[in-house]
Design a protein with these regions (language model features):
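Transmembrane alpha-helical segments of polytopic membrane transport and secretion proteins
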Residues: 1-46, 72-93, 209, 222-226, ...
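Conserved beta-strand element within WD40/beta-propeller blades
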Residues: 52, 102-106, 146-149, 239-243, ...
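Short loop/turn segments immediately following the C-termini of beta-strands
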Residues: 55-65, 107, 151, 160, ...
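Short loop/turn segments immediately following beta-strands, especially the blade-tip
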Residues: 68, 118-119, 159-174, 251-264, ...
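A short beta-strand motif characteristic of beta-propeller blades
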Residues: 77-85, 120-127, 209-215, 269-277, ...
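Canonical WD40 repeat/beta-propeller blade segments in eukaryotic WD-repeat proteins
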Residues: 87-94, 132-138, 217-231, 280-288, ...
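Short coil/turn segments that connect the beta-strands within blades of beta-propeller domains
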Residues: 98-100, 142-144, 235-237, 291-293, ...
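Loop/turn residues immediately N-terminal
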Residues: 108-111, 152-155, 245-248, 293, ...
């Protein structure tokens, strides 16, 4: 077949080979898809930048919060107020969590409530102690529970309840007396205006349990410490005491309570005598842990005597060590929160912190020793008291 014949008869061309697919018209992306895609891109970009800025903002905030820890401290403001009706022999003082009132417990059993900012007297209450003389006193860390030892060898446990209530302005009684700084009183409680168009009422009540004989009758208690424990239905109150003869006792008072409320049965006291103190010991202070497994006695010369009372039926004198330099007496003693740190204040103005640590090869009865772990800046005068925050 010649070329001319092909042109003359196109149907003669073979069609047995593969054929090309038909050409399709070009596609165009819809405008709505392009708009959505652009919005998604911008959203992701802006969101990513926002996350980065948020992280940097958190870093700046944390740096601002932490920086004061490294920049030292300074006093922003301070104020002083003389407490009206305050006695010279105060056993302890308690400030409420809002720093509105201060409660003072005096040796004669009176409990005075003052406005903290101005010192004005709000109310005077009283523990009814009769003719007994207070010779020893202890309180829990938050100050709500107290133990009072007397000259006849008895002990009474009490409570100081700082009660807070939030009121509507319409529930506030009339005729209140202005105290200053936005506080008012009706001579029973303090009323403070707070946010949300509300008023906070703070009042104090006290009560005292019946006396419990601890030492032989007529032998005064000279040192005391007190802790709370146990379960709600069977609360326990443990205390360690030293009487005028030098005898030291670990006691536990247990009361049965009904789950439906009220007290069932009579409070019972179980006491254990601890090994006698060395002859001539002049006790400055005494401490006990909440578990009643350790007791610490400090004499006025600066020697600490530690008792291991984990086995209550067989307590031991575990350690005797000096915690102040020779010739320097101990003026204050107490626990920090957790009862692992013991703060010791000295007549030379020193403030040191001790821990009870386990050490192999120690010559103590239980393998633990008291170790000075922190030495704080010395004060100009002797340290006579300190207060630990409950938080």
């Amino acid at each position: 077949m010649t070329d001319s014949s092909i042109h003359q008869n196109p149907s003669a061309v073979s069609t047995d080979g593969p054929s090309l697919p038909p050409r399709r018209p070009p596609r165009r992306t819809r405008r709505s898809v392009l708009i959505i895609d652009a919005i998604a891109n911008w959203t992701i970009t802006i969101g990513g930048l926002g996350v980065i800025l948020a992280v940097f903002g958190i870093m700046v905030f944390l740096a601002e919060v932490v920086w004061p820890l490294f920049s030292g401290s300074h006093v922003i403001a301070q104020s002083q107020a003389r407490l009206e009706g305050a006695a010279s022999d105060v056993l302890t003082e308690i400030v409420d969590e809002y720093r509105t009132i201060v409660v003072s417990v005096e040796r004669n059993g009176e409990v005075t409530i003052n406005h903290l900012a101005t010192g004005r007297l709000i109310k005077t209450r009283k523990f009814e102690i009769g003719e007994r003389k207070v010779t020893a006193f202890a309180r829990t860390l938050n100050g709500e529970s107290v133990a009072i030892g007397f000259d006849d060898g008895s002990l009474r446990l009490g409570r100081i309840k700082i009660e807070t209530a939030i009121l509507k302005p319409s529930d506030v009684p009339g005729g209140l007396t202005e105290l200053g700084r936005g506080d008012r009183t009706d001579s029973e409680a303090v009323y403070s205006a707070i946010e949300g168009d509300q008023v906070r009422r703070i009042a104090v009540s006290v009560d005292l349990d019946e006396p419990q004989p601890i030492a032989p009758e007529g032998t005064a208690l000279v040192a005391l410490d007190f802790r709370l424990g146990g379960a709600a239905e069977r609360p326990t109150r443990s205390f360690v005491s030293i009487d005028a003869s030098g005898a030291i006792r670990l006691s536990r008072l247990e009361t049965k309570r009904s789950l439906l409320g009220g007290i069932s049965g009579k409070a019972t006291v179980n006491s254990t005598d601890l090994p006698a103190l060395p002859a001539g010991t002049q006790v400055a202070s005494i401490l006990m842990t909440s578990l009643a497994d350790q007791a610490y006695v400090v004499d006025r010369a600066g020697t600490m005597i530690r008792y291991d009372t984990r086995a209550t039926q067989k307590p031991s004198l575990a350690e005797r060590t000096r915690i102040t330099p020779e010739g320097v007496g101990v003026t204050t003693l107490g626990f920090l929160v957790g009862e692992e740190s013991i703060v010791v204040g000295g007549a030379d103005g020193s403030v040191n912190v001790y821990f009870r640590l386990q050490r192999s090869g120690s010559d103590t009865a239980d393998g633990f020793v008291l170790v000075k772990t922190h030495e704080l800046e010395r004060h100009a005068g002797e340290v006579v008291a300190f207060g630990a925050s409950p938080r």
